[in-house]
Amino acid sequence: MLDIKYIKENPDEVLARLAKKGKDAKEEIAQILALDTERRNLIAETESIKAEQNKMNKQIPVLKKEGKDVAPLFAELKAMGAKTKEIDERLKTVDTQLTSVMLGLPNLPDDDLLPGGKENNEPLRYFGEPKIFDFEPKNHVDLCTDLGLIDYKRGTKLSGAGFWIYRGMGARLEWALLNYFVDTHIGNGYELVLVPHMLGYECGLTAGQFPKFAEDVYWLETAEDERRRFMLPTAETALVSLHRDEILTEADLPRKYISYTPCFRREAGSYRADERGMVRGHQFNKVEMVQYTLPEQSDDAFAELVANAENLVKGLGFHFRTVKLAAEDCSASMARTYDIEINIPSMNGYKEVSSVSNARDYQARRGMMRVRRENGKTEFVHTLNGSGLATSRILPALVEQNQQADGSVVVPEVLRKYIGVDVIKK
C-alpha cells in the first residue's frame, strides 16, 4: 500500500511514476484525495459535536441547581448523539472505500527503472559462455525421459496437464538441488523456516497479490464458518506475513529467512511449444529468500539477495545473465526487480530462475509491520524477497548443459556429495 500522505503531497509525481508501470491512476488518485478530504471533514465535524456535547453536559448540573428547565438540552444532546452516529456510519463507509482504492494501487517503481515492459528490460551482466556441443544435443524432455528422471506420462495420469513425477535419480537430483540451496543459505546466515502450505486471505493481501490476483491461486473449499484458505503460490506469501501486525526493534533487523516449499499456481493460458516439460507447471519446488530491513538497509539487502541467487547458479557452473526489469515488467507489489535468467539450449534463449525484488514499505503498510527506533518513534520496515532458487527450470538447464554424447549427464560438483554419483546414465 502506498503512503497516503505522500500521495496528497505529490499527486502528479505519483501519477507519473505509476504511468511507468502502465497504470493510468488519475481516477484512483482523484478518488483518494476526495475521500480523504471527506474523511477529515467528517472527523472534524464529529469532534466539533463532541466538544459541544461536553460543554452542554457541564452546563446541565449548573442549570439544574438554578432550577432551570434542562429538558431542551437533553433533547439537543439526543439529536447530537443521533447525528454523531450518522457521521460514524458514513465514516466507516468512507474508510472502507478509501482502503479499497488504496489496496488496488500498485507500488511505485524506483526512479532509475525504464518505463514499459519486457522490451525495455536491461541485461546487466553475463556469466560464462553458452554451451557448444560437438554432437546433436537432446532437449530436456527427451533426456529426462530416456534417463528415467521424470515421468511425464504418469504425472499427467495422476493430476492432468502441467504435472510430472520425479523418479529414481531424478528425485535424488531434485533433492540434491534443494539441499544445496538450503545449506548455502544457512551458511550465509539465513534462518530456515518451514511454513504452512495453506494460507489465510490476509497473507495474500499483505504480499500484495490480493485482491487483484486472487483468482491466480488454488482456493480450498471450506465450510462457511471456516477461515478461507488457499495453496501458497510462493513461500514469499507466507514469509512476508511472519511479522504482520508486529512492531520490531532496531536490534531485531535485518531478519533473514529462507523457506523450502512446493508452489502451486493456476498458470492460466496456453503453453508455448518451447515450454513443454517442466518449464511451466501447476506445482514446482522452490527455496525462497525474504528479508525485513530498516529503510536505509534495503538497497544493500537487495544487492545481497541478488548476489546470493547469482552465486547459487555460478556454483552449478551454468551460463546465465542478470537482467534489470523495466517498470511495467515488475510485479504490482515491487519497486524494483532483477531476474537471473539461465540458458536452456533447446529453447534458444533464457528463462528466469530467480526474481529478486524490493517492495520498499509497500507490503509493510499492508501488513502493519513496523520498527520502533531508538528514539521511540515507529516507522514501516522494508521487505525484500528472491527465489533462491526454483528447480523447475534449473533441472532442465542442468541436464541440457551437462549432457554428453552418449546421453549421460554430468552432475555438477557441488551436488555430488548429496547425490553420490558424478554422472547420471542409463
Q: Over which residues does each language-model region extend?
A:
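N-terminal alpha-helical targeting/anchoring segments
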Residues: 1-131, 145, 149
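TRNA-recognition modules of translation machinery and tRNA-sensing kinases, especially anticodon-binding
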Residues: 126-426
